[in-house]
């Protein structure tokens, strides 16, 4: 489940799905605008992807409202987080990870962040993230 403004996080999301499929999972790429809390129980594990926006925060118009709605369903759910950023040091991801832990989510692996467009290392890390959810 992802939101992407420039296509960078969408590229990462595609790599996550590819990694999950290579590991034997049935995986679906879903835009944040098409996902909601009522769908959480349909999935054994979920990767959430959102770039850093503004002052190192989640995208506020689509992704954050969707994710906030899902928070009550995170307890005991295996998840992974990923996203791109233009500047900063990844504070948005650390804050997001803390929120997920406080909500009782099980982080399946280290989160993946990359600056701007994902390079080969970031694509590989996203594929590994997808596989870790299987």
Task: Outline where the language-model segments fall.
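FMN-binding flavodoxin-like domain, especially the glycine-rich phosphate-binding loop
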Residues: 8-11, 15-134
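Short hydrophobic segments within beta-strands
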Residues: 1-3, 82
């Amino acid at each position: 489940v992802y939101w992407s403004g420039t296509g960078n996080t969408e590229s990462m999301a595609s790599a996550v799905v590819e990694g999950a499929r290579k590991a034997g999972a049935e995986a679906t790429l879903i835009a944040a605008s098409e996902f909601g809390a009522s769908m959480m129980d349909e999935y054994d594990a979920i990767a959430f992807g959102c770039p850093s926006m503004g002052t190192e925060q989640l995208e506020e118009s689509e992704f954050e409202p969707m994710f906030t709605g899902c928070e009550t369903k995170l307890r005991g759910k295996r998840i992974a987080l990923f996203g791109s950023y233009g500047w900063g040091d990844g504070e948005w991801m650390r804050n997001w990870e803390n929120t997920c832990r406080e909500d009782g989510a099980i982080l399946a692996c280290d989160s993946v962040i990359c600056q701007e467009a994902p390079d080969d290392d970031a694509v590989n890390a996203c594929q590994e993230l997808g596989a870790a959810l299987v």
